[in-house]
């Protein structure tokens, strides 16, 4: 990995890289990714779990016991459960969402995929998602994974971030451009 990817730098990048290498050796990359995606969804759905993970108020012992109970109840095992327990023991559980993001980036790079961060004003239907994926694939020549975020403040259009490139065709940006042009003219 000669090229440094900003999405896998820092503490979270080191943990993600270690987990990725371990999963690659075990030939369990897809299983670990699925587990991490599920854990990420659990964090999004449970404010209590998110608080346990992110709050420094909980002691290491309390955090470890609570996480072990959550992992057991949710049916996590193997590499992912051990990894999350290591994060907890090292007092780095607060960084788990960044670790998951970095792990996803490593998996995408390994599979030759490119992840596009797409911001839209309203949820896109499958037809529009497929059309966007096809258009981006024709530009990059690689498989595309879309991470879609809905942000009504862009009013309309979309913002696409693909690596270091960004295309902002949002209505908000166009209106701001017109507003600035009118201020300069008048």
Swiss-Prot record:
Q: Identify the InterPro entries for this entry.
A: ATP_synth_OSCP/delta_N_sf, ATPase_OSCP/d_CS, ATPase_OSCP/dsu
Main location group: membrane
Provide the GO MF annotations for this entry: proton-transporting ATP synthase activity, rotational mechanism
Cite a GO CC annotation: plasma membrane
Report keywords, A-Z: ATP synthesis, Cell inner membrane, Cell membrane, CF(1), Hydrogen ion transport, Ion transport, Membrane, Transport
In Pfam terms, one family for this protein is: OSCP
How does this protein lie in the membrane?
A: Peripheral membrane protein
Compartments where located: Cell inner membrane
Indicate the family of this protein. Belongs to the ATPase delta chain family.
Q: How does it assemble?
A: F-type ATPases have 2 components, F(1) - the catalytic core - and F(0) - the membrane proton channel. F(1) has five subunits: alpha(3), beta(3), gamma(1), delta(1), epsilon(1). F(0) has three main subunits: a(1), b(2) and c(10-14). The alpha and beta chains form an alternating ring which encloses part of the gamma chain. F(1) is attached to F(0) by a central stalk formed by the gamma and epsilon chains, while a peripheral stalk is formed by the delta and b chains.
Biological role: F(1)F(0) ATP synthase produces ATP from ADP in the presence of a proton or sodium gradient. F-type ATPases consist of two structural domains, F(1) containing the extramembraneous catalytic core and F(0) containing the membrane proton channel, linked together by a central stalk and a peripheral stalk. During catalysis, ATP synthesis in the catalytic domain of F(1) is coupled via a rotary mechanism of the central stalk subunits to proton translocation. This protein is part of the stalk that links CF(0) to CF(1). It either transmits conformational changes from CF(0) to CF(1) or is implicated in proton conduction.
List the NCBIfam families. ATP_synt_delta (TIGR01145), PRK05758.3-2 (NF004406)
Protein's name in the database: ATP synthase subunit delta
- Lineage, highest ranks first: Bacteria, Pseudomonadati, Pseudomonadota, Alphaproteobacteria, Hyphomicrobiales
């Amino acid at each position: 990995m000669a090229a440094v990817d900003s999405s896998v730098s820092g503490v979270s990048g080191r943990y993600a890289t270690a987990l990725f290498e371990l999963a690659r050796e075990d030939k369990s990359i897809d299983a670990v990714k699925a587990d991490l995606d599920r854990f990420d969804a659990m964090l999004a759905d449970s404010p209590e779990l998110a608080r346990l993970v992110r709050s420094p108020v909980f002691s290491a012992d309390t955090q470890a016991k609570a996480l072990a109970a959550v992992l057991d109840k949710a049916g996590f095992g193997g590499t992912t459960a051990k990894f999350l327990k290591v994060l907890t023991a090292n007092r780095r559980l607060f960084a788990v969402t960044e670790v998951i993001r970095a792990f996803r980036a490593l998996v995408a790079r390994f599979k030759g995929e490119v992840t596009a961060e797409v911001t839209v004003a309203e949820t896109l239907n499958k037809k529009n998602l497929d059309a966007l994926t096809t258009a981006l694939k024709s530009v990059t020549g690689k498989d595309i994974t879309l991470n879609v975020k809905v942000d009504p403040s862009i009013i309309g259009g979309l913002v696409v971030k693909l690596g270091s490139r960004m295309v902002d065709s949002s209505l908000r940006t166009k209106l701001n451009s017109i507003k600035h042009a009118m201020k300069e003219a008048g």
